[in-house]
Amino acid sequence: MADPSTYRPAPGTIPDAPGVYRFHDAEGRVIYVGKAKSLRSRLSSYFADLSGLHPRTRQMVTTATGVRWTVVGTEVEALQLEYSWIKEYDPRFNVRYRDDKSYPVLAVTLHEDFPRLYVTRGPRRKGVRYFGPYAHAWAIRETLDMLLRVFPARTCSAGVFKRHSQIGRPCLLGYIGKCSAPCVGRVDADEHRRIVEDFCDFFAGRTDTLIRKLDREMRQASEELEFERAARLRDDLEALRRAMEKQAVVLGDGTDADVIAFADDELAAAVQVFHIRGGRVRGQRGWVIDKVEETGTAALAERFLTQFYGEQAALAEQADAGGTPVPREVLVPELPPECEAITEWLSGLRGGRVAVRVPQRGDKRALMETVERNAKEAFTQYKLRRAGDLTARSAALQELQDALGLDTAPLRIECIDVSHVQGTDVVASLVVFEDGVPRKSEYRRFAVREGAEGGDVGSIAEVVRRRFARYLKETAPPQEGGNGSAGATAAVENGSTDTVAANGSVGTAAGNGSAHTAAGNGLADTAAGEPEADVAVTPQEAERTGIDPETGRPRKFAYPPNLLVIDGGAPQANAAADALTELGITDVAVIGIAKRLEEVWLPDEAEPVILPRTSEALYLLQRVRDAAHDFAIRYHRQKRSKRMKSSTLDSIPGLGEARRTALLKHFGSLRRLRQATVEEISAVPGFGQRTAETVHAALAAGGGTGESRDNAEGESQ
């Protein structure tokens, strides 16, 4: 661990101005990002007596080897820059909001000709509008089933929709009145979209207008003696009212608001959010965070508002499906310290005025108390789980260190597994665990090349060589003149200019004199008064430390593991160790874990290490091995499926994936496409006469088969 005094900024070098600061470790990774009204006051607090610091803060400052800062003009700029850097660098010591679970949402595919309604937990997609999240999937599915009577929109997948279009008969929902059956032309695209838009209006909280409209139509139908239509509208009204009863009115004035509450102790905190739209609870979410420093409720509120609404705005922009991520009102237990800056920033995201308030009395105060009770309950459950989890992970790492005779606990573990079927479509996976927790953003996969001929042993050796050759390449020191050694990439620049972004403001690194240009409008980016070898990262230092000098971010293979786990026995472990020896790497421990008996093999050892069946170390190794196994199998299946689906179309020049998809979608199958004439092919959008003739000739020459091809992908990064 580093002594904070070795990189403490020299007296007088830290400006007394608002700004954003970032601590980095010996490899140049940013490990913490923070902002302050006064950089001098805030940074000085980190270099006080270590015994008086929060445990996580103490761990952070002793892990760091340097600190840099950026001066900004306003607190809003500091807020924006802090959020951007946290999102970019993903610092390990910053507050991380982790969902207690993946909450279900209701999705509406507005980008399709016939929009579909469905419940999902998956990633957000462009052109899809989302409602929720909801606490229980069964509840939203029950509500959706009830509302399909009123809004008979499509809920089937693209495959089911296409199949029923071809056979000319609707599915069961079409027969029982819960789908308008656009697949067989009962309604056209415009009419179906109106149904979907009414559904979206209802879920967005505009219920009164819809109910008045249906009530008016029901009375009109009754007056015109259309009793069947009036009865159907009456049933629709009843279904709507039943659905609304499931969402109790909590704020009688039709308020749109998010109600946020916290429960915390000195090490962690839980946050709960109730999303109120039109006075009704439309969604609920919960997170748990690890505190880095002694943080009160007001500071927690500020950080949560910044991260949560920043991410929601990014998702809304990505989905491009309308709606605003920020409500008119945000209710919090305590106002953030920089409430005006937060309010201004939120108003910018919304495109209209946003009020951040603390409810004092009435319904809003009662609702806040309800959310606080939920937060306390969630926090209690989290602490019960976390107590066992932290203890188990710490014990597992210590047991591994002792059993394998390692110098330090293996804080970073990598595992390699190979997957194939009888030597075909040979692929490998590499998974990463840090502090006993999967680091999925650093998972990698490999398409095995020449090593496949040597079976699992040859494949393992190839993957190890490729992974660690990249590590050596990305961390090799540069030669004179800016050229890296041992196959390293050439240095990006000569001299000592570190360009973070462009705007012409320059700040001087203490004790070095190298210039730095920071992001934003006139932001001065300054490195702390550190020793000569640990000042701002120049392009040459970046090459040595594995930091990309253009982006300032770690390269993909820049950090070696403390322990390399191979899914296999002694032969596989020996192959991995030999590959490392060839590369001159001697500081990475290698083991193999054999299936069935769960034996741990060390290279060149005649007997395995037997870990107790109930040990936390064995359980951790099994988790790592299983994660690599699952990741490899998924890639193998994907690669095999791609090869099996390859056809004559793949070899036609000028025919890309989009055009191939358009052809198959238009004709339904390759067989029907072969039977098509040139004129029929040219009728497909995007196909001219010449392209149609090329396709027709290629299919005629290819006959009825068309050999499959294996498209090797190399490393997927």
From Swiss-Prot:
Subcellular location: Cytoplasm
GO CC terms of this entry: cytoplasm; excinuclease repair complex
Keyword DNA damage: yes
GO biological process: nucleotide-excision repair; SOS response
Pfam families: GIY-YIG (PF01541), HHH_5 (PF14520), UVR (PF02151), UvrC_RNaseH (PF22920), UvrC_RNaseH_dom (PF08459)
Keyword set, alphabetical order: Cytoplasm, DNA damage, DNA excision, DNA repair, Excision nuclease, SOS response
Coiled coil: none
SUPFAM superfamilies in the cross-refs: C-terminal UvrC-binding domain of UvrB (SSF46600), GIY-YIG endonuclease (SSF82771), RuvA domain 2-like (SSF47781)
Biased composition (Basic and acidic residues): 541-553, 707-717
InterPro entries listed in its UniProt record: GIY-YIG_endonuc (IPR000305), GIY-YIG_endonuc_sf (IPR035901), GIY-YIG_UvrC_Cho (IPR047296), Hlx-hairpin-Hlx_DNA-bd_motif (IPR003583), RuvA_2-like (IPR010994), UVR_dom (IPR001943), UVR_dom_sf (IPR036876), UvrABC_protein_C (IPR050066)
Domain spans labelled UVR: 208-243
GO molecular function, one term: DNA binding
Superkingdom, taxonomy of origin: Bacteria
Region (Disordered): 517-555, 696-717
Domain GIY-YIG: from-to ranges: 16-95
SMART domains for this protein: GIYc, HhH1
Quaternary structure, from the entry: Interacts with UvrB in an incision complex.
Similarity field: Belongs to the UvrC family.
Function: The UvrABC repair system catalyzes the recognition and processing of DNA lesions. UvrC both incises the 5' and 3' sides of the lesion. The N-terminal half is responsible for the 3' incision and the C-terminal half is responsible for the 5' incision.
Name of the protein in question: UvrABC system protein C
Organism: Saccharopolyspora erythraea (strain ATCC 11635 / DSM 40517 / JCM 4748 / NBRC 13426 / NCIMB 8594 / NRRL 2338)
Classification of source organism: Bacteria, Bacillati, Actinomycetota, Actinomycetes, Pseudonocardiales
